[in-house]
Curated annotation (Swiss-Prot):
InterPro entries: Ribosomal_uL16 (IPR047873), Ribosomal_uL16_bact-type (IPR000114), Ribosomal_uL16_CS (IPR020798), Ribosomal_uL16_dom (IPR016180), Ribosomal_uL16_sf (IPR036920). One of its GO terms (cellular component) is cytosolic large ribosomal subunit. It comes from the Bacteria. Part of the 50S ribosomal subunit. This is Large ribosomal subunit protein uL16. GO terms for biological process: translation. Binds 23S rRNA and is also seen to make contacts with the A and possibly P site tRNAs. It holds the Pfam family Ribosomal_L16. Belongs to the universal ribosomal protein uL16 family. The keyword RNA-binding applies.
Length: 136
């Protein structure tokens, strides 16, 4: 699972997921999976989508993960009274804005890449779209 090796502070405020995305262009591979909606991806979802793609392309080509879960999400145990401090870190998420490229792929045909990204998109809680690299 993806998570930071070390952080200055263990716990983080909830914050808001507003604004525009960085990393909106396909830069490493030929094809990409771009987020249309706004939300957050957990480390488990990122890994599940990566596995689905890797299995479908049968380890040919190359896959880049363009997102990293760097925000800790805490929760208190069940049946615990309010107060007594913030809960423990349960999992890590990455906040996604519309237009962010989530995954990139190279070395496979467009048809195979489309199928692989469709399988990956089924594992994600966001609406996504298939994009290709634009040559300037």
């Amino acid at each position: 699972m993806l998570q930071p090796k070390r952080m200055k502070f263990r716990k983080m405020f909830k914050g808001r997921n507003r604004g525009l995305a960085n990393g909106t262009e396909v830069s490493f591979g030929e094809f990409g999976l771009k987020a249309v909606g706004r939300g957050r991806l957990t480390a488990r979802q990122i890994e599940a989508a990566r596995r689905a793609m890797t299995r479908h392309i049968k380890r040919q080509g190359q896959i880049w993960i363009r997102v990293f879960p760097d925000k800790p999400i805490t929760s208190k145990p069940l049946e615990v009274r309010m107060g007594k401090g913030k809960g423990n870190v349960e999992y890590w998420v990455c906040q996604i804005q519309p237009g962010k490229v989530l995954y990139e792929m190279n070395g496979v045909s467009e048809e195979l890449a489309r199928e692989a990204f469709t399988l990956a998109a089924a594992k994600l809680p966001l609406k996504t779209t298939f994009v290709t690299k634009t040559v300037m």
